[in-house]
Amino acid sequence: MKHLTGLCNCSAATIATLLELASDYKKELLKSNPQFQPTLCNKRIALVFFENSTRTRFSFELAARHLGASTLNFAAAASSVSKGETLSDTIKNLEAMQVDGFVLRHPSSGAANFITTITSRPVVNAGDGANEHPTQALLDLFTLQEHFGRLKGIRIIIIGDVLHSRVARSNIYGLLSVGAEVGLCSPVTLMPPDADQLGITMFTNLEDALAWADAAMVLRLQLERAAGGYLPSLEEYSVYYGLTDERLDRIQKNLLVLHPGPINREIEISNNVADRIQPPGYSKSMLLEQVTNGVAVRMAVLHTLLAENGK
């Protein structure tokens, strides 16, 4: 694997290898004084973020440091991009500084694939427009596998703005690749038109979707969707598609709850559900576990691309 720009063409075997390595890294991360082999010692990784990020950027930075690499943090607003420099020129200039790899977040779909055509360095897609966010999907798969002990055959319902979600797209590709069953639940205005061609079960009623699923992945609702005419109002969306205690308690099953963050509390998910770590009821929030797993998964990705490819 030279780059990780998406999961659309990522094999089940590749996913399994990355998750196995992530599992080893997580065991060490959870120790009071974790010690890692510095497999990326003297490597320089450019974190090129054209959009804001908390979890993804910081976890990539931690992942790189755990493996002995140094990071260059690029912020578009404080760079020559603000003076009109193109993405292509930015990447070429960083490569000329002998950067060993790129982690890119960009608002344009296809940006990560584009820069693989202009650099010989490994590229990791940290989210490009509405296209893909592969490391988020990998950490979601890792979280599910840790809990269920497998991925094949489990049912995951993805709830919310599937149409515009790069997280949903990468998860759909990854989950189908490993043999999981995928369901989508959203208003028809936020459902991708090609979903029925992928062998996906579609729902418009949230209660039916939750009853079908083993795990629920709640997507962040981009608040501008109401203003854009995709929704009558945020309040109505919350009434019909918000994940609440009452909805989870009615299905009376051990449902796992995931969310990629950031959260719009009391819109797509209630405070109680988001924070339900050890519940008295039937469901469990994995939101913070996902964040922990993100560091281990991104360590696995960086090691695979920069250490193994450099042998």
Curated annotation (Swiss-Prot):
Binding site for carbamoyl phosphate: R55, T56, R105, H133, Q136, G261, P262
InterPro entries in UniProt: Asp/Orn_carbamoyltranf_P-bd (IPR006132), Asp/Orn_carbamoylTrfase (IPR006130), Asp/Orn_carbamoylTrfase_sf (IPR036901), Asp_carbamoyltransf (IPR002082), Asp_carbamoyltransf_Asp/Orn-bd (IPR006131)
Gene Ontology MF terms in the entry: amino acid binding; aspartate carbamoyltransferase activity
The EC number(s) this enzyme carries: 2.1.3.2
PROSITE patterns: CARBAMOYLTRANSFERASE
Catalysed reactions listed for this entry: carbamoyl phosphate + L-aspartate = N-carbamoyl-L-aspartate + phosphate + H(+)
Pathway the protein acts in: Pyrimidine metabolism; UMP biosynthesis via de novo pathway; (S)-dihydroorotate from bicarbonate: step 2/3
Biological process annotations from GO: 'de novo' pyrimidine nucleobase biosynthetic process; 'de novo' UMP biosynthetic process; amino acid metabolic process
Gene Ontology CC terms: cytosol
Pfam families: OTCace, OTCace_N
Sequence intervals crossing the membrane: none
Annotated binding of L-aspartate, by residue: K83, R166, R220
Enzyme class: transferase
Superkingdom classification of source: Bacteria
Keywords of the record: Pyrimidine biosynthesis, Transferase
Function per UniProt: Catalyzes the condensation of carbamoyl phosphate and aspartate to form carbamoyl aspartate and inorganic phosphate, the committed step in the de novo pyrimidine nucleotide biosynthesis pathway.
Quaternary structure note: Heterododecamer (2C3:3R2) of six catalytic PyrB chains organized as two trimers (C3), and six regulatory PyrI chains organized as three dimers (R2).
Family affiliation: Belongs to the aspartate/ornithine carbamoyltransferase superfamily. ATCase family.
Protein name, per record: Aspartate carbamoyltransferase catalytic subunit
Natural source organism: Chlorobium chlorochromatii (strain CaD3)
Lineage: Bacteria, Pseudomonadati, Chlorobiota, Chlorobiia, Chlorobiales
